[in-house]
């Protein structure tokens, strides 16, 4: 262990493998007249935390003593004893308390901690990440209070941090998660040719007070029309124009096809000159009653409009029915497109602009964007998704946590939780790797073995 008062924690790493032997004497007192197996099980279950924390403390003290000896041997007479500094860490196997030895270095005019010269110790925290990691997953799936209970259930002594501490520490973990993969060095086509975009509202708070609501927005894409979806961009409070700028930096080429629910601003920001914009047909059918309601027509007065809308054949297809359409049968596709356009024109004549301003604008938008899939099929022979259902499926796994369990968020907290939920839902392997990295499983492993075991009955 090459000790050197460098001023940096871990400045004296273990240069080669060394073995520390701990001679442990364990005394087991067995009372008479007790169910022995059950009593032993309970005793060792209670003892496990004490045993491991005692051994862990002994190892730290041994490393500290050796490092101090090496420092004093390398720099004779340089250091003066300055007492100790108490430290405490809550680890997965229980609490560890240690008095860190302090040495005064008059040459460098600073305090030297031998143990910090040998290893990097957790700074300014009592609850170590290794203890909190099992609770982070429950924070994503359920809530921070459930996360706190999970940590308490795993701790040998039943201790747990407050849910406020879990929330605060979770932010650092979530900041390491990015649901947008790095495509910089990936060969082949990027998953931005076929994009889907959607947004929703999220309530925010600032310093405990209502801060209104912000737009929660998500853009996903795939390499083929029906290929696996990957996150291209996610945001809280950003406009579609800001999202478009980030997408153009990652993917300079505009998408071939863009599918949205018709939210204002999506096609203007995300679509390029050659992009085909397809309106989600599920939202198209669902949003007509709201447009009529905006024009002041209650349910009893809008049946004739809804019936005429239902006679547009191109808006009634589902994805399975479209898959059964023969792409080589151009006359049949052209007939379906023309019939749909004629039905749209008939509906348009029933909607004078003076009486139906919102509904007329809504229907005119659907004539172009709602039937885009038929024009694309006629021109290329290729089917595209008719709805944002696959994107809505991703939303369903995220919004339960963000809008039902958690009701109010700060903007950074909402963004961190959105990232964690997306990574957990779409890339579980990457989430598991992030947990493993937090536990240090990527580092060279220390081997702990019981090399000999001998039992002796006391006389």
Language model regions located:
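Short, surface-exposed amphipathic charged segments that create phosphate/polyanion-binding patches used
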Residues: 209-214, 291-303
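An N-terminal, globular interaction/scaffold subdomain
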Residues: 41-91, 98
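Short basic-aromatic helix/loop recognition motifs at nucleic-acid
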Residues: 135-142, 384-386
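Acidic/histidine-rich catalytic cores and adjacent linkers
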Residues: 2-65, 253-275, 305-459
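Inter-helix linker motif
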Residues: 273-297
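DNA-recognition alpha helix
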Residues: 146-157
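RNase H-like nuclease fold core
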Residues: 2-33, 80-84, 88-89, 95-132, ...
């Amino acid at each position: 262990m090459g000790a050197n008062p460098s001023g940096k924690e871990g400045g004296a790493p273990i240069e080669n493998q060394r073995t520390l032997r701990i001679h442990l004497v364990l005394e087991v007192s067995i009372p008479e007249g007790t169910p022995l197996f059950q009593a032993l099980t309970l005793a060792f279950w209670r003892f496990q935390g004490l045993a491991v924390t005692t051994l862990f403390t002994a190892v730290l003290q041994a490393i500290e003593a050796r490092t101090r000896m090496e420092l004093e041997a390398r720099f004779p007479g340089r250091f003066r004893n300055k007492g100790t500094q108490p430290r405490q860490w809550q680890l997965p196997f229980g609490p560890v308390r240690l008095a860190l030895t302090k040495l005064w270095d008059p040459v460098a005019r600073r305090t030297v901690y031998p143990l910090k010269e040998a290893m990097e110790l957790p700074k300014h925290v009592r609850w170590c990440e290794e203890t909190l990691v099992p609770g982070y997953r429950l924070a994503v799936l359920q809530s921070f209070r459930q996360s706190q209970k999970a940590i308490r259930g795993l701790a040998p002594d039943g201790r747990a941090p407050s849910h406020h501490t879990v929330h605060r520490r979770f932010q650092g973990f979530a900041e390491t998660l990015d649901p947008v993969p790095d495509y910089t060095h990936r060969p082949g086509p990027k998953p931005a040719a076929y994009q889907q975009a959607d947004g929703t509202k999220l309530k925010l708070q600032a310093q405990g007070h209502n801060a209104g609501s912000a737009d929660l927005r998500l853009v996903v894409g795939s390499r083929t029309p029906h290929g696996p979806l990957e996150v291209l961009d996610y945001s809280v409070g950003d406009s579609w124009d800001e999202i478009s700028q980030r997408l153009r930096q990652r993917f300079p080429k505009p998408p071939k096809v863009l599918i949205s629910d018709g939210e204002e601003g999506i096609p203007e920001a995300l679509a390029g000159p050659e992009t085909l914009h397809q309106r989600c047909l599920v939202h198209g059918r669902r949003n007509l009653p709201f447009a009529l309601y905006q024009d002041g027509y209650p349910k009893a007065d809008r049946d004739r409009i809804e019936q005429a809308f239902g006679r547009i054949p191109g808006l009634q297809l589902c994805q399975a029915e479209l898959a059964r359409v023969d792409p080589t049968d151009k006359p049949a596709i052209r007939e379906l497109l023309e019939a749909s356009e004629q039905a749209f024109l008939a509906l348009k004549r029933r909607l004078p602009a003076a009486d139906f301003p919102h509904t007329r604008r809504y229907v005119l938008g659907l004539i172009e964007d709602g039937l885009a899939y038929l024009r694309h099929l006629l021109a290329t022979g290729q089917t595209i998704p008719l709805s944002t259902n696959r994107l809505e499926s991703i939303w369903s796994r995220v919004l339960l946590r963000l809008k039902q369990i958690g009701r109010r968020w700060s903007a950074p907290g909402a963004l961190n939780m959105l990232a964690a939920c997306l990574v957990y839902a779409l890339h579980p392997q990457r989430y598991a790797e992030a947990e493993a990295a937090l536990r240090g499983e990527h580092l060279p492993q220390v081997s702990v073995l019981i090399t000999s075991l001998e039992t002796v009955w006391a006389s």
